[in-house]
């Protein structure tokens, strides 16, 4: 198995990213797909694109995918409150999402105080070394949803994670999500105005979390997210 990662940017501003874990015979088509995504993206033409291929030498940890909860009227305030995220923490998370900084990874906040707990600046924390497998083989989830569900499932695979809020920084995509192990994966429609680059990924955690261990899991442990529709 091989890890394939792509990152593209323009003048050091993030444009696009993608990654997966695949068999050797899928490398060529995966690289072509990531190349097309990186160079022909609505966020603009990159002046830098990097594709990294690395053989996986460690055992791959299986993670059960969160269930997708279909609810057109999902309310972010109610969802976060149900998961133990305070209004203060949510407001602080939205401040990060709406500011002008384009973060390339997630920001980790206290679910109680909203204080930022990681120290990675604009880079943030990157959930990497993962793949997604739909064991139903129905193909009813598009690539955007499978990528988001895979990341959300990895991020929430820890007992001290209360939930994750994600808003895409793509110009015309206005649907975000809130996900947690407790309540599943909820899409949030029209969470931002169209034609805006603001967005981000916020992880709300219990202050007792072993941050170094958690970050190592997200960034270094090979993971396969297995999805089964119930």
UniProtKB/Swiss-Prot annotation:
InterPro entries: BioW (IPR005499)
Class of enzymatic activity (EC top level): ligase
Pfam families, sorted: BioW
GO biological process, one term: biotin biosynthetic process
This protein's UniProt keywords: ATP-binding, Biotin biosynthesis, Ligase, Magnesium, Nucleotide-binding
Cofactors, names only: Mg(2+)
Metabolic or biological pathway, per its Swiss-Prot or TrEMBL entry: Metabolic intermediate metabolism; pimeloyl-CoA biosynthesis; pimeloyl-CoA from pimelate: step 1/1
Reaction catalyzed: heptanedioate + ATP + CoA = 6-carboxyhexanoyl-CoA + AMP + diphosphate
Organism superkingdom: Bacteria
Family (UniProt): Belongs to the BioW family.
Assembly description: Homodimer.
Protein name per the record: 6-carboxyhexanoate--CoA ligase
């Amino acid at each position: 198995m091989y890890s394939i990662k792509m990152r593209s940017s323009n003048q050091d501003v993030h444009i696009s990213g993608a990654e997966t874990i695949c068999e050797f015979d899928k490398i060529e088509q995966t690289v072509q797909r990531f190349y097309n995504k990186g160079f022909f993206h609505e966020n603009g033409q990159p002046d830098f694109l990097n594709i990294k291929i690395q053989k996986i030498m460690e055992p791959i940890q299986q993670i059960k995918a969160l269930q997708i909860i279909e609810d057109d009227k999902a309310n972010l305030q109610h969802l976060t409150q149900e998961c133990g995220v305070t209004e203060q923490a949510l407001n602080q998370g939205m401040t990060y999402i709406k500011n002008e900084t384009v973060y390339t990874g997630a920001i980790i906040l206290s679910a109680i105080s909203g204080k930022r707990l990681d120290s990675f600046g604009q880079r943030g924390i990157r959930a990497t070394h993962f793949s997604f497998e739909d064991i139903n083989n129905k193909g009813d989830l598009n690539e955007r949803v499978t990528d988001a569900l895979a990341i959300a499932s990895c991020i929430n695979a820890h007992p001290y994670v209360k939930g994750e809020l994600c808003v895409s920084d793509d110009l015309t995509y206005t649907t975000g999500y809130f996900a947690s192990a407790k309540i599943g994966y909820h899409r949030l429609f029209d969470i931002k105005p169209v034609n805006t680059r603001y967005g981000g990924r916020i992880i709300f955690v219990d202050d007792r979390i072993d941050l170094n261990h958690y970050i190592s899991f997200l960034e270094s442990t090979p993971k396969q997210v297995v999805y089964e529709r119930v």
